[in-house]
Structures are given as C-alpha cells and as structure tokens.
Amino acid sequence: MSKPSDHIKRPMNAFMVWSRGQRRKMAQENPKMHNSEISKRLGAEWKLLSEAEKRPYIDEAKRLRAQHMKEHPDYKYRPRRKPKNLLKKDRYVFPLPYLGETDPLKAAGLPVGATDSLLSSPEKARAFLPPTSAPYSLLDPSQFSSSAIQKMTEVPHTLATGTLPYASTLGYQNGAFGSLSCPSQHTHTHPSPTNPGYVVPCNCTAWSASSLQPPVAYILFPGMTKTGIDPYSSAHATAM
C-alpha cells in the first residue's frame, strides 16, 4: 500500500532513537534473522537498560518532538484503520438454524414476558404443547404410596421376543429368550427402567421362578445342535 506524498511521520520516541542504531547492528550480525525477531530482542534489551543509560535517548526524543511541532504545528496523529475482518463481521461461525413457526409458544403469539410465567407454571405451559401419541403418562411423585410402589415392583419389565431380532432366527423361543415373552394379553403398566416418572403399558405376566434364570449364550460348532446341551452340567464338568 503506497503512502500519500503529504504523509507526515510521527516523531520518534526514546526507544526508536536507541533501536535505530542497534537494529542495523543486529541485522548485520544476524542476516537471516527476521525483522520481528530483531524487534523482540531489541525490546527485551531496552527493558534491561537503567534510567541513566536511557537518559540520553529520552532527551534526544524530546528534542525531536519539539522540532517536529515547530515544523508541523497542525499535525495530528491519525492511525491507519485496518480493514475489518470478514470473520468478525459474522459473530456466529455456526449460525443456528431457523425453526420457523413450529414452536408452539411462538406460534401462539405470546409476548416476550409471558414465557417466564409459563416456565414458572408447568400446568399453563403444558396446554401449549402439541398432543403426543406416545402411550406414556407422567406420574406425580405424590401419587406413589407404599402399596402402589410394592405393586409396581412385583410387575416385571419384560421384553417381547419380537424386539430381539436374533432370538427368533436362532430358534430360542423356549430358551432364555422365551422366558421374556408375553403369552398373556392382560394389559397393565409398570415403571419405565430409564425414567421412573413414566409408566409403560405391557401385556406381560408376573415373574415366574423359571423367568429368573439368567440368559445363557450358546456357541454351536459344526456338527453340533443346541438340543441336549445342559450349560450348567457342562460348566460343572469343566470346573471339575
């Protein structure tokens, strides 16, 4: 960038007066050293100088400043403005997507201050939520009594065989996975294992003694079938 012909340089300060000769000397001693590294070293050396060593350069800087004011009485320092960075222009590097009018509170046309009152009152906020088709219901902790908790603990959380993709293909309907099936059509609810505040409907019967057996993994080798294999007797024979 070319400077205008009428550009007036600033008067040198004490450090610039001292570093003018030192920079030339250091550049001759280290021709491959970058100019920024030279400036860094000169600044460190200038800080190590005592006030008595800096005094001649301070006086020279004052003389140059007075001379500069005489030559340019209307001089005013105007720093060059750096071009604005394009990244700073966009404050959000990853802008949030616009969700449109899908927000129930926004679609209802509520004022800005009304959302605070809705957050403090869950009953009012629940009225703006869209209806859901999920068969789960939120239970209030005050509704749980000792008898209700005992009844819910007696009801197991079982999995249907259809939810296990490998159970039917391996043919273990009557094995460990078969004990997890729901043969009865009696509908009841039990607490969700992931969220105790929800109940999940299930067509399951109560736990039986056979369903408490842990699942056993079978490893079938060529020429072997799963019939006739007793895992407990095999494990006992191996341990012996």
Swiss-Prot record:
Keywords, ordered alphabetically: DNA-binding, Nucleus, Repressor, Transcription, Transcription regulation
Gene Ontology MF term list: chromatin binding; DNA-binding transcription activator activity, RNA polymerase II-specific; RNA polymerase II cis-regulatory region sequence-specific DNA binding; sequence-specific DNA binding
InterPro entries on file: HMG_box_dom, HMG_box_dom_sf, SOX_fam, SRY-related_HMG-box_TF-like
GO process annotations (BP): brain development; entrainment of circadian clock; negative regulation of DNA-templated transcription; negative regulation of transcription by RNA polymerase II; neuron differentiation; positive regulation of transcription by RNA polymerase II; regulation of neuron migration; visual perception
PROSITE patterns: HMG_BOX_2
Chief localisation class: nucleus
DNA-binding region: 8-76
Region entry Disordered, spans: 19-38
Subcellular location per the Swiss-Prot or TrEMBL entry: Nucleus
Tissue distribution: Highly expressed in developing brain and spinal cord.
A GO cellular-component term linked to this record: transcription regulator complex
Entries under PANTHER family matching the protein: SOX TRANSCRIPTION FACTOR, TRANSCRIPTION FACTOR SOX-14
Function field: Acts as a negative regulator of transcription.
Protein known as: Transcription factor SOX-14
Organism: Gallus gallus (Chicken)
Originating gene: SOX14
